[in-house]
Amino acid sequence: MNKKNIKDSQNFITSKHHINEILRNVHLNTNDNIIEIGSGKGHFSFELAKRCNYVTAIEIDPKLCRITKNKLIEYENFQVINKDILQFKFPKNKSYKIFGNIPYNISTDIIRKIVFESTATESYLIVEYGFAKRLLNTNRSLALFLMTEVDISILSKIPREYFHPKPRVNSSLIVLKRHPSKISLKDRKQYENFVMKWVNKEYIKLFSKNQFYQALKYARIDDLNNISFEQFLSLFNSYKLFNR
């Protein structure tokens, strides 16, 4: 993505009071290694470095990298890397968590990368409030893809007045907690096809009338617009059984 576009979409939180208020909802300790997505001017970086074992910040803007590096020059447990997070290769065979106040206009790309390319046990992200709600909406394909790998929760609402420049909308702090994958590698493609047909309401391409009735009954679904992820998995498993 164009660096200028990313830079223009960034909104910073600089108040120590607001930062500490947000971090009270983030479960970190002195043993944690953190990958921070976007150091900004180092305000969150500074507080993370005080709390955690080691912090690696990934920042696309070289000017912000210099500002952050100078701000944390006395911290030996901190480094900032000048790189686009979408081009960054997450470490393998290493335990870490992720924290980031991420640009609104690439939130989907960043979250996909975290979920499907990293091994982070927990990821704490500041995102636009409406986007956070969409991540919990099982009528949307993105939510149905992500939930196979992580549990998603909204931890707090963050007023737009906390940021500068002030965005048009409020934000949320969310957490993605990794769990064992609920879809096997061999079923992944079939699951993706099922999701896309389901969200497009192409039920006739997935089930016969009788199969659909049986699948809904087994999953205990009364309202197609209000189903849990576990119920959706039940539908997919029924689909697999009908198509063996």
Swiss-Prot record:
GO cellular component, one term: cytosol
SMART domains to which the protein is assigned, alphabetical: rADc (SM00650)
Entry keywords, A to Z: Antibiotic resistance, Methyltransferase, Plasmid, RNA-binding, S-adenosyl-L-methionine, Transferase
Transmembrane regions: none
Catalytic activities: adenosine(2085) in 23S rRNA + 2 S-adenosyl-L-methionine = N(6)-dimethyladenosine(2085) in 23S rRNA + 2 S-adenosyl-L-homocysteine + 2 H(+)
GO biological process terms held by the UniProt record: response to antibiotic
Pfam families xref list: RrnaAD
Keyword Oxidoreductase applies: no
Role of this protein: This protein produces a dimethylation of the adenine residue at position 2085 in 23S rRNA, resulting in reduced affinity between ribosomes and macrolide-lincosamide-streptogramin B antibiotics. Is involved in erythromycin resistance.
Family indicated by similarity: Belongs to the class I-like SAM-binding methyltransferase superfamily. rRNA adenine N(6)-methyltransferase family.
Name of the featured protein: rRNA adenine N-6-methyltransferase
Organism, as annotated: Limosilactobacillus reuteri (Lactobacillus reuteri)
Gene: ermGT
